[in-house]
């Protein structure tokens, strides 16, 4: 089924608002950051572009330090959605149609972004790489993503689907990150 296929050559990672002053108050933040880092390492290995947004950085700070090295392009915003002219121009310039979304908060910025892009892009959200302050808000958003026909998977599913097989140098690197 085409809906469930991922293609690293047609993929962009959209890292939404994992920022210094926001991450500490998010549910399961360390778990989410660790899984997000594994996905971003996969993106680096396979040359998948990473677009990062920062929500009101004056108040919420920069992207958390451990993820900054993976950023390809960074866009600041005050809107909750990432469907902004600058971001959309970058996505169109890259020319890929699958957008994998990671970040926060699931029920606000992640939700509005997926809702606003789902008609034009294949949207994929990684359930273990998104979070909110309250788990109930995250779970409500995840249920809505499924209703929107957004593909909801986890980081291991994505990584192993892209790897396809064991034994490669990439497998050895990435399998260590997700243990």
Question: What is each of the regions a protein language model found here?
Answer:
Residues 8-11, 26-57:
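A short alpha/beta connector and helix-capping loop motif
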Residues 20-24:
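Short acidic, Gly/Ser-rich segments with clustered Asp/Glu that frequently serve as metal-coordination loops
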Residues 18, 52-55, 127:
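A cross-domain feature marking catalytic cores of carbohydrate-active enzymes
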Residues 2-12, 58-179:
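Active-site-adjacent betaalpha module
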Residues 12-18:
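N-terminal nucleotide-binding beta1-loop-alpha1 segment
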């Amino acid at each position: 089924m085409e809906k469930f296929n991922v293609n690293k050559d047609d993929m962009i990672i959209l890292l939404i608002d994992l920022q210094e002053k926001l991450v500490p108050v998010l549910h399961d933040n360390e778990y989410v950051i660790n899984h997000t880092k594994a996905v971003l390492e996969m993106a680096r290995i396979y040359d998948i572009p990473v677009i990062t947004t920062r929500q009101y950085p004056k108040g919420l700070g920069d992207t958390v330090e451990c993820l900054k090295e993976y950023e390809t392009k960074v866009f600041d915003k005050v809107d909750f959605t990432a469907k902004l002219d600058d971001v959309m121009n970058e996505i169109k310039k890259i020319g890929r149609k699958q957008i994998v979304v990671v970040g926060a908060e699931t029920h606000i910025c992640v939700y509005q972004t997926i809702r606003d892009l789902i008609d034009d892009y294949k949207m994929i959200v990684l359930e273990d790489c998104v979070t909110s302050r309250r788990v109930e808000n995250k779970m409500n958003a995840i249920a809505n993503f499924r209703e929107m026909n957004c593909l909801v998977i986890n980081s291991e599913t994505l990584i192993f689907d892209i790897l396809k097989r064991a034994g490669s140098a990439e497998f050895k690197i990435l399998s260590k990150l997700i243990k």
